[in-house]
Structure formats: C-alpha cells, structure tokens
C-alpha cells in the first residue's frame, strides 16, 4: 500500500544521492529519518513539527550546495537560513488558523500552547529575521539582488504584520496572511534564481 510506495521512494531518493559528494547521502538519510519522525509524531507536537517542515524545505539549498562543492555550499547556506525562517513563520501562522481542526485531530500545536497573539508575534519575529538574513547573499550577487530582495522583504514584512492584531483563529484566517506569504516566497525564489543566473552570465 502507501507505506510500501513511500519506502520505495525513500530508497530511490537515497540511492540517487550516493554518486554525489559524501555529505549528500548523509543529508538524504537525515531527511528521510526526519520525514518518518514527522509523520509519526513530530507533526502533533508544538513547534517541533514546524521546525521539521522548515528545515526539510530549506535543506533543498543545503543539498544543492553540498552537491556543487564547498564554495557553493557557503553561498547556499544563507538561502537555507532564509527559507528555514520564512517557512517557520508561515507554519506558525497556519497553525494559528487551524487550532480547531488540529485539536480535533489530536495535535498539540504552538498556538494551543502559547496562544494566538504570542504565536503571531513569534511568526513576525521569524519573518523579520528571514528578511535580514536575505541580504547576506548580496555580498556575492550585488546591488541588483539587494534591490530585488528589498522589495520582497518589504512585502513579506507588511503581510506578516497583518497577523499581529489577531486574537482568534478566525481573525488569522480572515487576514489571509499564510496565503499571501506564499506569493512573497515565490518572488524571493525568483530573485534568488535570476541573481544567480545573472552572476554566471556576466
């Protein structure tokens, strides 16, 4: 059934990582273990599930950097940090929206533990940290990257701030913060891609 199919996918993914540099299979093994732990227990725990999702999403950049070598890893590590913090922020907002549904499913999320208001502040702090970290690659990618990511940062911070006055899951959902965050994250990835391509071409 689904378990066998998942196991096959895990095995294929790990085998595909073997021909790459030695650190890549290790990262693949860690990620597989985290995915298993997330699906069995972490996703029902406050913050731990959010951290797991944020790490796994950002680890795409870690894997790419490791595969390309030490110099590329130094460049992609800040992208991992930005992605980790941004996804963590959005995950917390989503949990604040879904308190009732999560409670029915037996999950115990961060907003249930500390409340909607404190969760909104935590999400905003994470996004602010992500926005600050997003300027680190400007050392390699220059002024045009800095200008592009500044525009994205302003958008994401304004969107993240919309959740700060919220006191209930209904207010968080009505703000549509989690949905609008996705657009900013897609824009950030586009800025990453275009900046990296421009540096290679020029």
PLM regions and their residue ranges:
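Solvent-exposed interhelical
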Residues: 1-14, 83-141, 160-173
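Intramembrane alpha-helical segments
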Residues: 1-72, 78
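Small-residue-rich segments of transmembrane alpha-helices in multi-pass membrane proteins
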Residues: 5-9, 51-66, 111-116, 176-192
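Generic alpha-helical transmembrane segments of integral inner-membrane proteins
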Residues: 7-15, 29, 33, 55, ...
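Transmembrane helix-loop junctions in multipass membrane proteins, especially transporters and channels
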Residues: 18-22, 40-44, 69-70, 95, ...
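Transmembrane alpha-helical segments that form the membrane-embedded catalytic/substrate-channel core
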Residues: 32-40, 58-59, 81-96, 152-163
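Alpha-helical transmembrane segments
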Residues: 74-86, 141-148
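Extended hydrophobic alpha-helices typical of membrane-associated regions
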Residues: 139-202
């Amino acid at each position: 059934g689904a378990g066998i199919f998942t196991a096959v996918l895990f095995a294929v993914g790990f085998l595909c990582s073997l021909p790459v540099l030695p650190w890549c299979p290790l990262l693949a093994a860690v990620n597989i273990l985290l995915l298993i732990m997330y699906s069995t227990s972490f996703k029902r725990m406050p913050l731990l599930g959010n951290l797991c999702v944020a790490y796994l999403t950002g680890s795409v950049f870690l894997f790419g950097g490791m595969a390309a070598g030490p110099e590329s890893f130094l460049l992609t590590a800040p992208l991992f940090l930005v992605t980790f913090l941004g996804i963590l922020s959005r995950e917390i907002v989503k949990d604040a929206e879904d308190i009732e549904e999560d409670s029915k499913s037996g999950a115990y999320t961060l907003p249930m533990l500390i409340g909607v208001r404190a969760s909104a502040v935590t999400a905003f702090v994470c996004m602010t940290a992500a926005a600050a970290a997003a300027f680190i690659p400007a050392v390699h990618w220059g002024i045009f990257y800095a200008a592009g990511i500044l525009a994205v940062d302003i958008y994401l911070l304004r969107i993240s701030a919309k959740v700060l006055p919220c006191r209930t899951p209904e207010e968080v959902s009505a703000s549509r913060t989690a949905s609008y965050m996705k657009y900013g994250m897609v824009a950030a990835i586009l800025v990453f891609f275009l900046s990296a391509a421009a540096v290679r071409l020029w």
